């Protein structure tokens, strides 16, 4: 599940993912003194959450002066639990849930270096190159105007050359994505797991996405 934190003027502040209501309260302690979020939206996919769990989350947020304003879920019981606590709760299909996930403004810089796992539901976008040190889990979406480099395992969706750059590429230590896109060309990830012990790179050749070994000193 994912919390979207917003300020007094409904401006986006930050989003983060968590599981089984394991929330680091120190996170809020640090955040509240710097950016003072006023409200939060909870977005859950395929998760059944009862009213007791939601009440617990609501209490944690209220202790940090954050109001749980909205719940968006594709699970009807979760929606009913939210309504029982008088929280504005909406049932949405999975594709509509994705529209509730804003991009972190800090990810709109030209070149981005992200350290850590990119979890399901997370989105990272760069106006230049995107460098990720960590794994990209299934359900995560990463994109860049230029190249995407993952120093880890790529299981999610990767989109390079989103501004029309046909020379863009996607490279990873372990390249097994759900979907690859370079410029306007889209390909489903390979059915077989990578067998080699070397990094791989996906590039465009003859309007097709091909995957080949990637050596750090090679010139593309």
UniProtKB/Swiss-Prot annotation:
Assigned protein family: Belongs to the MinC family.
Assembly, per entry: Interacts with MinD and FtsZ.
Keyword Nuclease: no
Stored SUPFAM superfamilies: Cell-division inhibitor MinC, C-terminal domain (SSF63848)
Superkingdom to which the source organism belongs: Bacteria
Stored PANTHER family: SEPTUM SITE-DETERMINING PROTEIN MINC
Pfam families: MinC_C (PF03775)
Keyword presence, Cell cycle: yes
Function in brief: Cell division inhibitor that blocks the formation of polar Z ring septums. Rapidly oscillates between the poles of the cell to destabilize FtsZ filaments that have formed before they mature into polar Z rings. Prevents FtsZ polymerization.
GO biological process, any: division septum assembly
This protein's UniProt keywords: Cell cycle, Cell division, Septation
Protein name per Swiss-Prot or TrEMBL: Probable septum site-determining protein MinC
């Amino acid at each position: 599940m994912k919390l979207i934190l917003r300020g007094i003027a409904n401006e986006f502040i930050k989003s983060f993912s968590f599981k089984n209501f394991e929330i680091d309260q120190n996170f809020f302690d640090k955040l509240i003194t710097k950016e003072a979020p006023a409200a939060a939206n909870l977005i859950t996919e395929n998760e059944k959450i009862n009213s007791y769990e939601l009440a617990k989350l609501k209490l944690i947020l209220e202790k940090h002066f954050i109001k749980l304003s909205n719940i968006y879920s594709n699970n009807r019981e979760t929606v009913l639990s939210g309504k029982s606590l008088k929280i504005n709760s909406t049932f949405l299909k999975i594709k509509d849930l994705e529209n509730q996930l804003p991009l972190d403004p800090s990810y709109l810089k030209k070149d981005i270096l992200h350290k850590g796992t990119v979890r399901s539901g997370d989105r990272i976008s760069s106006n230049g190159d995107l460098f990720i040190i960590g794994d990209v889990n299934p359900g995560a979406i990463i994109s860049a105007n230029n190249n995407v480099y993952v120093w880890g395992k790529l299981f999610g969706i990767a989109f390079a050359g989103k501004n029309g750059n046909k020379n863009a590429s996607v490279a990873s230590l372990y390249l097994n994505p759900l979907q690859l896109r370079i410029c306007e060309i889209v390909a489903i990830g390979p059915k077989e797991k990578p067998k080699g012990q070397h990094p791989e790179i996906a590039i465009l050749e003859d309007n097709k996405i091909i995957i080949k070994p990637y050596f750090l000193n090679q010139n593309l």
